[in-house]
C-alpha cells in the first residue's frame, strides 16, 4: 500500500544526506586549499562581482564584441577595478585576469608546465582540428617540429617572392585613381596569396579578379569562392565559444557549421593535390625549396592531419600580417610626419619610383631600417595581433603577483583554473609606457626606457610557444610597407573615427574598413 509518510521520509533523508555531502565536500576543499596556499606561500586573488554567476558579464562582453569595443572594455575594466590581477566569473566559470608582466612570464615561460590550453582544443576543433594552436603536450611538440623548418631563416629571407603579389596589389590601388579605397580587404587578399604560395607551393591568387581584368588568369577550384568570408565567420564563432568558457558547446549553429565546411573544402583542394603527387614530384618540390605541405605529405598521408595543420598555419600566415599592415597604414595616414620620416629612410636605402632598387631590398637590409622597425613596434604595441589569450592550470600552483594589500604577493591558482592574460591592456599601461601610452609615437622606441620593458612588450607571445612565424610576419610587412612607399608617395586618411573599432576574434583587425588613398 502506498505510504506518503514513508516516501516523504525517504526523500527527506536523502536530501539531508546529499546536503551534508555537499557541505562536507566544500569544507574539505576549503581546508585543502588553505593547506596548499600555506605550503605555496600565496594568498587568494582579489575577487570582483559580476552579477549572477557572471552571465551579465558575458552579455556585456558579447555586446562590446559586436560593437568593436571589446578590447577597450577589457582594458577599462582593469582601470575600473584598480588592480592588474583579479578574479571573476563569466558564464559560471571562475576566471583570473591579469596584465602583470611577471604573471604573464610565469604563465608562458618560467611555469610553462603548470599550465595548458584547457578547453581551447574543444572550442576550436570544429574549424582548426588538431594543430599547433589547439594541441598540448606531445601533439603540440610534434606540430611545432614539423612547422619549424618552414620558418627557418633561409625560407623567410626569400622576399623576392612577394613582388608579384605587390604588383597585383598596386593594380588595385591605381584603379582607385587617387581616391579612397578599403586597404584592409586588399591586405587580407595579399597575405592569403603570399601565404598559400609560401606554405602550399601555389598561390590562391585572390587579388587577380574582375575589377582589374585578371579573373580568367587566376587559379580556380571548388571551394575557393566564399572561402575568405567563411574563414572570417568561423573565427567569429570560435571567439564567442572561447568567451563562453565551458559552455562553448552551446555555440554551434548552422552558420558556424556551414562556414567550417566551406573552409575545409578550400583546404582539401591543396591536400588532395599533394596526396596525388608522385614520389618523384614530391622530391622535385623539395629540390625547388622547402614547401610545408609537400614535406608533411612525406610524414603522413592522413588527409585530416594535413588539413588541420594547413588551416592552423594559414590562420597565422594570413590574419596576423593583414591586421598588422592595416593598422600600420591606418596610423600612417593619420600621422603625415611619421609617413615622411619613413619615406626618407626607405628612399635613402632603396630608392623610389622608377629609381627603386629592388635588388637592395633583402631580409638583412630591411632589418637595418631602424625607423621602420620602430614603426612596426609601435603598431604592435597599440594593436597586438592577439590582444588576449588564456591558459588553464594543470595542477594547484601560484602566480607571483596580485595578492595582498600592495598586490605584490603570490596568488593561488587552483587546478583547472582559467587564467586570461591581456597583452592589449599591458601594452597601454602608463606604468611601462608613460603618460602618453595611448598615443601613437614610433620615436618612443629610440628612448632608453623601452630597452628595459622585458615582458611588458609581448607582440608575439613568449616562452616555448613563442610565435614561430614572427620573422616571416615582420619581413613580409616590412617589404610591403617599403614597396608601397616607393610606388605611392602620397598617402591620406579618409576615416574620421578614432580610436578605431576593433574586431577581436582569434586575431585582431579593424571592425570594418580602413579607408585611405594612395597616389
UniProtKB/Swiss-Prot annotation:
Disulfide bonds: none annotated. It is an enzyme of class 1 (oxidoreductase). It is found in: Membrane. One of its GO terms (molecular function) is oxidoreductase activity, acting on paired donors, with incorporation or reduction of molecular oxygen, reduced flavin or flavoprotein as one donor, and incorporation of one atom of oxygen. Coiled coil: none annotated. Its EC number is 1.14.14.-. Keywords: Heme, Iron, Membrane, Metal-binding, Monooxygenase, Oxidoreductase. Heme binds at residue 467. InterPro entries: Cyt_P450, Cyt_P450_CS, Cyt_P450_E_CYP52_ascomycetes, Cyt_P450_E_CYP52_fungi, Cyt_P450_E_grp-II, Cyt_P450_sf. GO terms for cellular component: membrane. Its cofactor is heme. Its main location: membrane. Induction: By N-alkanes. Together with an NADPH cytochrome P450 the enzyme system catalyzes the terminal hydroxylation as the first step in the assimilation of alkanes and fatty acids. Belongs to the cytochrome P450 family. This is Cytochrome P450 52A12. It comes from Debaryomyces hansenii (Yeast).
Amino acid at each position: 500500500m502506498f505510504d506518503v509518510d514513508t516516501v516523504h521520509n525517504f526523500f527527506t533523508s536523502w536530501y539531508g544526506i546529499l546536503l551534508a555531502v555537499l557541505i562536507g565536500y566544500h569544507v574539505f576543499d576549503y581546508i585543502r586549499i588553505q593547506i596548499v596556499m600555506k605550503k605555496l606561500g600565496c594568498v587568494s586573488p582579489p575577487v570582483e562581482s559580476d552579477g549572477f554567476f557572471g552571465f551579465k558579464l558575458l552579455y556585456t562582453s558579447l555586446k562590446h564584441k559586436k560593437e568593436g569595443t571589446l578590447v577597450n572594455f577589457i582594458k577599462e575594466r582593469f582601470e575600473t577595478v584598480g588592480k592588474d590581477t583579479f578574479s571573476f566569473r563569466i558564464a559560471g566559470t571562475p576566471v583570473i585576469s591579469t596584465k602583470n608582466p611577471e604573471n604573464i612570464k610565469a604563465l608562458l615561460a618560467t611555469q610553462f608546465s603548470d599550465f595548458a590550453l584547457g578547453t581551447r582544443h574543444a572550442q576550436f576543433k570544429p574549424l582548426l582540428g588538431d594543430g599547433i594552436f589547439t594541441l598540448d603536450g606531445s601533439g603540440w611538440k610534434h606540430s611545432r617540429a614539423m612547422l619549424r623548418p618552414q620558418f627557418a631563416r633561409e625560407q623567410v629571407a626569400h622576399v623576392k617572392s612577394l613582388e608579384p603579389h605587390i604588383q597585383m596589389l598596386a593594380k588595385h590601388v591605381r584603379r582607385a585613381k587617387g581616391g579612397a579605397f578599403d586597404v584592409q580587404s586588399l591586405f587580407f587578399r595579399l597575405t592569403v596569396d603570399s601565404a598559400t604560395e609560401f606554405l602550399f607551393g601555389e598561390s590562391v591568387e585572390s587579388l587577380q579578379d574582375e575589377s582589374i581584368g585578371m579573373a580568367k588568369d587566376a587559379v580556380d577550384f571548388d571551394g575557393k569562392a566564399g572561402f575568405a568570408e567563411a574563414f572570417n565567420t568561423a573565427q567569429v564563432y570560435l571567439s564567442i565559444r572561447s568567451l563562453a568558457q565551458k559552455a562553448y558547446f552551446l555555440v554551434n549553429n548552422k552558420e558556424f557549421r556551414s562556414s567550417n565546411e566551406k573552409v575545409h573544402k578550400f583546404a582539401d583542394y591543396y591536400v588532395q593535390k599533394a596526396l596525388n603527387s608522385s614520389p618523384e614530384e614530391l622530391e622535385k618540390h623539395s629540390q625547388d625549396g622547402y614547401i610545408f605541405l609537400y614535406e608533411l605529405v612525406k610524414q603522413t598521408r592522413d588527409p585530416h592531419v594535413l588539413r588541420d595543420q594547413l588551416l592552423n598555419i594559414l590562420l597565422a600566415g594570413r590574419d596576423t600580417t593583414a591586421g598588422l599592415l592595416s593598422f600600420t597604414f591606418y596610423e600612417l595616414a593619420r600621422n603625415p610626419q611619421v609617413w615622411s620620416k619613413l619615406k626618407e629612410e626607405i628612399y635613402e636605402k632603396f630608392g623610389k619610383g622608377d629609381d627603386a632598387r629592388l635588388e637592395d631590398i633583402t631580409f638583412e637590409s630591411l632589418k637595418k631600417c631602424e625607423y621602420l622597425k620602430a614603426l612596426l613596434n609601435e603598431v604592435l604595441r597599440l594593436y597586438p595581433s592577439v590582444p588576449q589569450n588564456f591558459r588553464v592550470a594543470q595542477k594547484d600552483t601560484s602566480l607571483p603577483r596580485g595578492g595582498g594589500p600592495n598586490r605584490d604577493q603570490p596568488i593561488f591558482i587552483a587546478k583547472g583554473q582559467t587564467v586570461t592574460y591581456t597583452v592589449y591592456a599591458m601594452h597601454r599601461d602608463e606604468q611601462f609606457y608613460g603618460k602618453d601610452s595611448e598615443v601613437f609615437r614610433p620615436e618612443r622606441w629610440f628612448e632608453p626606457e623601452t630597452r628595459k620593458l622585458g615582458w611588458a612588450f609581448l607582440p608575439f607571445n613568449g616562452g616555448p610557444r613563442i610565435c614561430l612565424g614572427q620573422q616571416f610576419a615582420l619581413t613580409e610587412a616590412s617589404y610591403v610597407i617599403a614597396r608601397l612607399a616607393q610606388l605611392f608617395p602620397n598617402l591620406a586618411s579618409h576615416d574620421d573615427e578614432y580610436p578605431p573599432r576593433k574586431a577581436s576574434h582569434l586575431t585582431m583587425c579593424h571592425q570594418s574598413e580602413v579607408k585611405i588613398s594612395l597616389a
